[in-house]
Amino acid sequence: SSAASDVYKRQLLMMKSITLPDRWSMFFKQLIKEIYKLGVDSLWIVIIISVFIGTVIAIQISLNISSPLIPKFTIGYTTREIILLEFSSSIMALILAGKVGSNIASEIGTMRVTEQIDAMEIMGVNSANFLILPKMLGLMIFIPVLVIFSMFTGIMGGIFASYSTSTGMTPSSFEYGLQFYFNEFYIWYSIIKSVVYAFIISSIAAYFGYNVKGGALEVGKASTNAVVMSSIMILLADVILTHLMLT
């Protein structure tokens, strides 16, 4: 019953957050701040991880298909498919759940335990709307940018690996593989998935932060729970969205 009441409380919190802001000027100021803090500040980690993973994927695939029967361009083709379909959206979302989710949960949780949220409620401000909506929208607006950067840098990492001689890849066959049977829907599929993930990360983290009771220790527990819970929900959403959109 606790899980059901959790879901119910989260629905109530979402309904309270997703309303028109009282003061638009304030809302846009917050939105820009959150886009910068949650989105732009995550660019560097997305780029670093994507380059390395793209390189590793290309090297591992080239070692796995060292059979003379398999054409070399499959390395580029498979690297592209893995990065476009799964890595840039789902694996990135898991990494962002750790970075962004814990940030949101601890920030809102700290405001709760220092009684700032109670002060807002007394002043007649819709605290959920004021605190949560800019974070949710900010992440949902900027996550496609992160995904596109991740795809680009991941594939650049693969190209970088194809220039190394020991792997048996040639840049020309790798680049032919990158263009082979390209389906642009996969990029849209990843972007749509990532927006859903952004909603999951921000709403779950906000819920755990908003409902903290206690002190600093509970804030830490809440951000841990937020990361664990949103990771599970991301993987569940991944399965559901893949079934709906690709089969």
Question: At which residue positions do the language-model features occur?
Answer:
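Short, small-residue-biased leader/transition segments that mark boundaries at the very start
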Residues: S1-Y8
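Membrane-interface helix starts
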Residues: D22-I48
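Loop-to-helix entry region at the N-terminal start of transmembrane alpha-helices
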Residues: D41, I45, I49, I70-I104, ...
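Hydrophobic alpha-helical transmembrane segments of multi-pass membrane transport/permease proteins
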Residues: L43-I61, I240
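Membrane-interfacial helix-loop-helix connectors in multipass membrane proteins
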Residues: Q60-L84, F152-V195, S203-A222, L244-T247
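Short cytoplasmic-facing helical segments at TM-TM junctions of multi-pass membrane proteins
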Residues: I108-L133, A216-V219
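Start (N-cap) of specific transmembrane helices in multi-pass transporter permeases
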Residues: N126-V147, A222, A226
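Hydrophobic alpha-helical transmembrane segments of integral membrane proteins
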Residues: N129-L137, V227-T247
